[in-house]
């Protein structure tokens, strides 16, 4: 319902409907619903995993993803999709679901490319940001400049110019960190994030209760995949998705959701 409300009444940011305001306070429902989404999937998959159960879980996951796609929030749609596919594989141990998910993701990527103009712009900027560095390639070019300028040890606090990157507090915070604190600091940050993910996986592995096991795995997948999308986009490893870096990027909805996940 909340995702549908954003689709109808949400404000458009960078071509996507991500949030709506209540009494002047902006909310991004897709962030909060991640937790409920994982809990529901864990509950369904912890019961008897019949074909009907799997079908119903697939319908629910598809409904969430389709609403997000309609809102043009493709980064969140990708997180929801990947989380479902991996959780389904963990619950059933059937490789078919992974292969099917990969095929579906490839088809969805091609379809999104032709349906959404901002996706085509991001793909073009990712392929070669230098061809239009003053316009479509400006963000990713400035991001790479910032990382390169910071080098291994960084330029120092307030010594860089991260403000030259549009939306640096939300989408490009990793580049700003590397510019001022250095690539080594960025590597340490990634190592901390990975260690947190591995701890979540360990907790899930030792859980004997299926519901808690799948819920832990699901929240861990959401966390690490969001980090992958953000840092991958900042470093030009993958196209930009507009996803925030958990606990680091500016954004109350993202920070609060991540805190609730760890709680």
Residue ranges of model-derived segments:
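Hydrophobic alpha-helical transmembrane segments of multi-pass inner membrane proteins, especially
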Residues: 1-136, 175-233, 260
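Residue-level recognition of oxygen-bearing side chains
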Residues: 32, 152, 255
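Active-site phosphate/pyrophosphate-handling residues
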Residues: 36, 172, 254
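Transmembrane helix boundary and interhelical junction motifs in multipass membrane proteins
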Residues: 73-78, 154-157, 168-170, 187, ...
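TM-adjacent membrane-interface loops and short helices in multi-pass inner/ER membrane proteins
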Residues: 129-170, 174, 183-185
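A juxtamembrane structural motif centered on a specific transmembrane helix
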Residues: 230-263
